[in-house]
Amino acid sequence: MRNHILTASSLADALGKGHFKTQLDLMIAKTSTEEAPFISNNIIEWGVKYEPIATSFYEKMNHLKIVEFGLVPHPKLTIFGASPDGICDLDSPTDYVGRMLEIKCPPIRKFTKEVPYHYWIQMQGQLETCDLEECDFLQVKLFEYDSDDRYNEDISYN
């Protein structure tokens, strides 16, 4: 389904403000009659690997539970959908109920105080699709130790 609809994550590309595809490449991909295979890369795999850890961190930090929904079709625009990373459930503190969460775990991108514009566009598409008003943008920098010795060095109190 995702191959033939515009999703919030590709909205910035559609507007010519993205970093991943040109408008022409996106149009060709979305209008092709063939199913395009999903092409992963190291950055995507890193995010998939660490997003659950970031979600758990957010849940514990804010004393709430995040619910995942997968691809949510827009209620009116049949050619649009969004896959938010999660939405705070009804048992969350009152000021968090219905708040959306967008997570990025970039292995190499530098963090800034502002949400990168192409991600802000993505979040606006997600909020519109889900008819919500707020979205927290969580960036998490994680790294892996290459050895037990390196880890032990890092945690020693000497």
Model-derived segments and their meaning:
Residues 1-49, 53, 144-146:
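Charged, glycine-rich intrinsically disordered N-terminal tails and low-complexity linkers that flank
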Residues 60-84, 88-158:
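Nucleic-acid nuclease catalytic cores
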